[in-house]
Amino acid sequence: MRVRLCALGLATLLGAAPARAADAPALEAALHGWLAALLGPGVALSDRPVQLVPQDNHWAMTVPVTGGIGDGLLLLGAPVTATLRAMDGGRWALDAIRLPPDLRLSAATPQGESVWTLTLRDQDAHAVIDPALATTSSWDGRFGGYALHWQGPGGERQTEAVHVVSHLAWQPAAAGRIDVTATGRSELLTTNARMDRQGLVSFSAARTDAAGHIDALLPARVPALIQAALAAAPLLTPDASRHMSPELRGALGAVLDVAGDLLAGFGEQVTMRDVHLHTRGMDLAMRMLAFGVNVSAPDGRIALKLHFAMDGLDGGAALPGGVGGDLVRHIALTPRLTGLPAGRVLALLHEALAHGGEDPALPAEAAALMRDNPLAVGVDDFSLELGPARFTAAGDMQVLGADQVSGQARLRATGIDALIRDARDQPALGQVMPLLVFLKGLGEPDGDATVWNIAYTGGHLTVNGTDLSQMVPQK
């Protein structure tokens, strides 16, 4: 509520034009109050975190960034500058936004100091902001020569992109909430990391497109979300999962406190082109790699949907027989999970964080959660193009516990006979040829395709009516 009241006061002040020196103190004070409410007590603001100088019909805005912004966090860089112009309806126009071309952030953590250095060679950004959230607000930025370097406990990492384009919009939704959407594109993205445990890891993509959304976000909870993220971010080092400090547990607990506010719906989809990955003992190339996640809880129960797709895999010597892009042409998988109550899941995660995952009661509580709330697992889409063959599948499974699982699926394939013939001459397929022949024997013809109707219940696995229970591992 404090953020909304500050924003309304800010909109009223900004509605006055032209820019006058006499108005600067009141406007700066309003901006100070708005930022203080948004960032919380963890960020110590200066007396003038935003400085305004009137110039004709707009303000020249300067935002100093050097200084402490939280417990153990220190920023060093040139000020952010922009022109600020009042628009109709209390909106702002922010033009000629310029971020620090060189920005350094250091964070003191229990494992040691982490340092991030951001470099921007070229930039062009502008925004339209409605502090009252009554109309659509937006941000658009174009950056060239993007580079982000991290060094800290466990290693160092350098990420670069020739061009980065970003767009962010938030607009009013029902019941005083807002919908947030974001898109981004990078060209010639590369990441090179040297980690103490993994050695050298290199990744590159000729082009990356990303899109994300948060639905029906409650504005009053935005400050808590930002403050929780600020507290947790510097503690998430590569070794954090192995050495989870009490500070990190507390910060992640605060994130969980506000996570329920995101369950109206949020998600992200990323698509990469011409991807290369090198790690110790592995070199992979893909023409396309896509992945995504969508989470919501429309009826108080979590609905999770994942997506993964890949075209033209070339694994070189890393995969059996040297799997090439002409063999694994396409893979796509879209699984979903529904049924677990959001409140109980968040409470269980809170308890696991509080005890570092070592509470002996946690397994029993997790089992009770599954027993009381049947978990539905499904695959909406599965497709695999392997040489001349194409496999597709869909299915559903109900989980009441580790020993109470039932489900059904339908697998369909075309070109499997040609694939079996090719397996005689291709080393990459020779190792799986017995499996292909076995599957073909279980299948039933369906025109030019082969189908497998699969069912599992009461410990019995059947494929097209044939009981294969003896092949299922038993306790």
In which residue ranges do the predicted regions lie?
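Bacterial N-terminal signal peptides that target proteins for export
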Residues: M1-A7
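Bacterial N-terminal signal peptides
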Residues: A7-G15
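Sec/Tat signal peptide C-region and signal peptidase I cleavage site
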Residues: A17-A21
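Glycine-rich, small/hydroxylated-residue low-complexity segments
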Residues: A22-K475
